[in-house]
């Protein structure tokens, strides 16, 4: 769960059969990312490893844009693989080792092929729900939490989550028995 657990929800690879308690390998790696609920310590829809391509061959940033269009009332926070978001009281700080690859080019624009340094992105859907455009802006290196996060105007659960829970019942049953 990592970063996702602190947020209202997150962009999860829980649909990857290799991550199931009883792992199976789908040789075609034909699985989809899914929106999963978090503990809601911070408002927003979090995408960890934002700059990475997982075993399904899909760049998380690209898929996160699609997820944002399905959940246009939520603010997205994309955290690169080597970046971290530190929150202390009313302030936040982006931690970014400059010797690691990431999606932030020197001019502050996005690199889908990790030609920059790690960073954190803020994503918003602008326009009508069915035709909204996802806008991405680089989060400042530090600032007020109130400027980074915002509460959702609408939330819709991902209907695919039930299917994943059905495919991976052992993990759910193990948690229930505790």
Locate predicted features.
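C-terminal and late-domain segments of enzyme folds
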Residues: 12-178
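Catalytic nucleophile loop
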Residues: 1-8
């Amino acid at each position: 769960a990592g970063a996702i657990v602190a947020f209202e929800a997150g962009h999860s690879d829980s649909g990857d059969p290799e991550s199931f308690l009883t792992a199976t390998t789908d040789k075609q790696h034909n699985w989809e990312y899914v929106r999963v609920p978090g503990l809601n310590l911070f408002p927003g829809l979090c995408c960890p490893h934002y700059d990475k391509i997982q075993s399904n061959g899909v760049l998380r940033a690209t898929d996160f844009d699609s997820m944002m269009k399905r959940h246009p009332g939520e603010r997205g926070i994309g955290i690169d693989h080597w970046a971290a978001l530190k929150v202390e009281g009313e302030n936040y700080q982006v931690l970014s080792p400059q010797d690691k690859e990431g999606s932030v080019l020197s001019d502050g624009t996005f690199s889908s092929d990790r030609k920059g340094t790690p960073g954190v992105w803020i994503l918003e859907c602008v326009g009508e729900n069915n035709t909204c455009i996802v806008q991405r802006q680089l989060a400042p290196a530090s600032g007020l939490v109130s400027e980074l996060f915002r509460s959702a105007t609408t939330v819709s659960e991902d209907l695919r989550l039930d299917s994943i829970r059905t495919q991976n019942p052992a993990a759910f049953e193990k948690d229930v028995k505790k």
